[in-house]
Amino acid sequence: MNIETINITNYRYFKHYEASFCPKANVLIGRNGTGKTTLIHAIIKALSFIFSNDKSLGKDFLSAGNNTLNVKSYNTSDFHFNQETREYSSEASIKATGIFYEQQLNWELFKRNTPKSALYTSLYKDAFTSFMTSAKSENSEWPILAYYSDSYPHVYSRINKSVLDVINQDIIPRNFGYYQWDDESACTSLWEARLCNRIAKMQPLYTPAARVASAIYEKEESLTQKELQADADYQKLKEEDNRLTETMKPLYNEVNYIEQKLTSFISHLPKVQAEGFDIDYFFATQSEEGYKLTINFKNGSSSLLQDLPAGYRRLFSIAIDIAYRSYILNQSVESSGVVVIDEIDLHLHPALEQVVLNAFMETFPQLQFFVSTHSVSVISNLDTSKTSTDGADKRENQILVMNIGEEQPQVLPNLLGVDYNAVLRDFMDTPSRNEELKNLEDLYYSYLSMDLKNESQTIYNQILALVGKDAKVLETIQNKAKEYEVH
């Protein structure tokens, strides 16, 4: 599933806004106050139509048994506020188009700003019916939907008893893969508890499995095939081996899927590998608060997930969250769907900013990503020249610039390999540090040549603030300044 277009009317920051999206990566950039957060929340709200439980739409719902799933309606503060008239809009609308199982979906979430008003279900009924028909067909995949706020994963959601009971089940309800999918807080502790539970159940099985395998091997080495068939002890050993295998298989498959996804993700992050954070294996560590996920790395070190550096912890947590949702929804099948990451560059070293988006795209190749960023490293390392392989002449990735007062974003040209300073200057409306320094130098020399001592000192102080008092460039500036001083 992916979302192709959105058309917003009277929602929060926007009087009107519309945008078209690419199937792989959509990077949102722009200064604060341009509406990036509003657009992100509009996308999330639009996608929630699949969780309708309105009885007028039928009897079969994805939300069945999970009261956290529903269509996201509009709150009073969601209606656009006109600062000139000091009035809220009388209605709000988010229209969207998308594709699920090659079916074109068109829907609208519309609500009037009156007491007790509700969403007009008729405006998303056809899309919902089409979606559910595909979703409920035999062997169908369900799309991943996930949102990661700029506070993720540092604000945890509480795990109450009912949720704990669910994650401790051997077989989890399929729609639990959508649990708190759009929440500001993190489900990391939830998946961590689940993963540790699986690991803890596996660990006691290794010793008897190894013992049985050894006994089977000894008999097979010493007896003929005919003797083995007549050997009652051998038959019992084979039965026990099958029992242990069947018990361990679902546990192993689940743990291995998450482990392999995180391993794959790290393989696309050279800096993480260079620092020795290649995963060797997971294990569960007992603490006063219960089991905690410990990661053993190939360099011999180990760390609790929660004790990793902030940037690594966020990336690992997002990768684990996506992987777990995918596994619960579709087992080991590569899932499609939509993932939204606010401030993808948060807490990251520049070397990681350059590759983080591509790492997510390579690890989860069927997903459509929406990410916001202020990092020039992110946008200048995304190849937006690639086109779809399905024959359609459509770009897979794009960078969208949002500006104040505009009703749609600007699509940037391919910036892959473009000089960072040029990107800052020409496309992010931000002067590079080098350019800013040059402008200050020129002004400083001009004031010196006019013998404006106070003004020149003020500019020099700004240079100090920009480069630091120990910067080598200061010596060059001081030497050149002598040529401009009035004697």
Where are the regions that the model predicts?
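P-loop NTPase switch/coupling surface
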Residues: 1-225, 443, 468, 472-487
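Switch/communication elements of ASCE P-loop NTPase nucleotide-binding domains
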Residues: 1-63, 287-432
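Acidic, Mg2+-coordinating catalytic modules of nucleic-acid enzymes
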Residues: 22, 137-140, 394, 408-487
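Phosphate/oxyanion-binding loops and surfaces in catalytic or ligand/nucleic-acid-binding neighborhoods
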Residues: 46-50, 151-155, 265-272, 385, ...
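Hydrophobic, Leu/Ile/Phe/Ala-enriched alpha-helical segments that form helix-helix packing faces
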Residues: 47, 96-98, 127-136, 255-273, ...
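Short linear motifs in intrinsically disordered
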Residues: 74-89, 273-287, 383-393, 435
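Soluble or luminal CAZymes and related metallo-dependent hydrolases
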Residues: 123, 127, 250-258, 314, ...
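Extended helical coiled-coil dimerization/tether regions that scaffold
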Residues: 181-313, 317-334
